[in-house]
Amino acid sequence: METSALTELERIGAWTRDQLPVMRRRHELAAAANRLSGAGFVEIPGVTMSLTEAYAKGRDLAALFGTGIISNNDFTAEFKGELVHQHIGELKHLAGDADASAAFVAGLSGPVRQGLPNLLLNTGSSTARADLAAFSAVFGAALRATKPPPGMAEYQRELAAPTNADAAWQRLALLKGSGAPSQVLARTARLVLDEFAADPGQDWFGGALDEYRAYGLPGDSVTLALQVIADDPVAVRSVFAEMGRPPVELTRPERMNLLFEYARHRDADVADALGRTMATGSGVHNEQPGAHSADAAAFAFDAITTSASLGQDMPASAQGSMAELAASYGHEMIAGARIEDGESRDSGMTAPPHLSTIPGLTPSFYLSPQGTYGFLKTFAAEQKNTDTFDKAMGELRHDLLVQAARLDGEALRGSPPKDPGYFEVTAGGIGDLAGMEYAAALKTRGDMDAFDEQMRGIVTDTASLALGAAPSPEKGVRWLIWQLGMFGTGKALDAWEDGDPADTRVSKLDGARDKWILAQRYDIATKLWEGGFPADPPWPASLMKDGRPLPLEEPLKDSKIFETFSAWSDSTDTDGDGSTFDKKLAMGIRGTISPESAVTAKGYEKQP
């Protein structure tokens, strides 16, 4: 029997067995380099160490830093600090190799691993914060190793073992910013947060004052536990799904409420960390609005409805995160603000009956109008927070109106022509949310004088349309138009409630009033044009530039352009022609600027 084929297969198998460890290390080195650089593509050198050599490198550095420096009683603290600083570069390089890092961590003694932040500080190093960051990176890499040396199992057991507040603080300080696996971060944070769920009233301070100052970390272990998971969505959701078990059985909203209540009576760091975890667990930083994962959306629903119950009592340091959360869930905010579909409906994960269809709106859940208003109040007190929300809503407003205009226009060109009215419904949803935001800002700020003055200045100073804080002039105009909608809601609300006497906001608008109205008309008209909604006669060539309608700043600078636009718009309205361009324009303006939702929101304040 011919055996040459079998011999060849055996040769290939032997080669494969030799190559697999190298291939695995190439993969892990690439993953580590990608984590450190944040780049989409990474370039790494060839594998220069075998697995055995990587383990030896890690063990040698562990001996150097452990018994050689940190635990060496023959050296003064000052000399230890000099040695740590001298060799820290080797440690930073080690973080790029998970296998070598794992050998390093496994080679340290348990007391060194468990008390490293304190031990580093005791060396007297003037660069303790940077030194701890280097150690954290190595520990994170070690915990990501797929085939760690046996000693790593002991460290894993140490991390999972219950301990006192001081030791827990040391563990958390070392893992903060380490990039350790989600399950490790969650498990370590829960050692503190599980006890917190059982007895939130006890003293949660660990570590020492000099450690807080040296490392820039909070002394409150609850705060530090939240900071450790605050950038990892999987870890956040894991903690809030299990915190307190056993023996304390709580729902996720109850866990959130417990921490919000704690944050309201502690320093700003607690609320800041809690707000960040709410945003991270909701997928704010790693998912797209309108396309959130089921896990992130379910978390966000609980975060938003729980926060809404606090309203303007939300701690100030968490309000920025609430604005980011609202911006990321703009689809849900518009759906929740709809008052025509039932201002007294409850919040839920499924669509309520008879909810109007807004094309392009893809909410993952459905807030009640009252819940939407309550959540808006969690961040509306500060202009910088509403700016965050308004920038996102300006973009969404543009996209939804253009899509609705396109669908209505296509239907009108069908046979038989029939306008489904998506544009009006979409404009109404946008107007409802803008009105509620205005009411929330008015309630939390006490007055809107500063906002009004800003809006008046912008519409009378066309240079402001560039809006340097926006990523581009076009995005700046979209942001401005959203805020002008709020401005218009306030104007209409005054007229609604006060009959527009001489001393109201409306009467003080002077020349800005006409410009504001014209800006709204022009913007809505451009959305109809972008969507291809039919107009007869078509958009005038004199109002075009580079194949598009003139940008908004052009008519604001030249009133004659507005006159030409208004005359053309009026000419598109022919009695008996059904959904003409001008009629569609009027309905769009009426929808986007309405005081009804603001009046409804004010009514919620009167409820017990």
Where does each model-flagged region fall?
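N-terminal secretion-targeting helices of virulence/extracellular proteins
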Residues: 1-59
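Short, solvent-exposed segments of well-ordered alpha helices
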Residues: 3-7, 212-220, 453, 457
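Membrane-interacting alpha-helical segments
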Residues: 27-35, 39, 189, 204-205, ...
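Long, contiguous all-alpha helical interaction modules
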Residues: 268-608
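Charge-rich, low-complexity amphipathic helices
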Residues: 28-38, 42, 247, 403, ...
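Helix N-terminus capping/helix-initiation residues
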Residues: 2, 97, 181, 232, ...
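Long, composition-driven intrinsically disordered regions
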Residues: 36-359
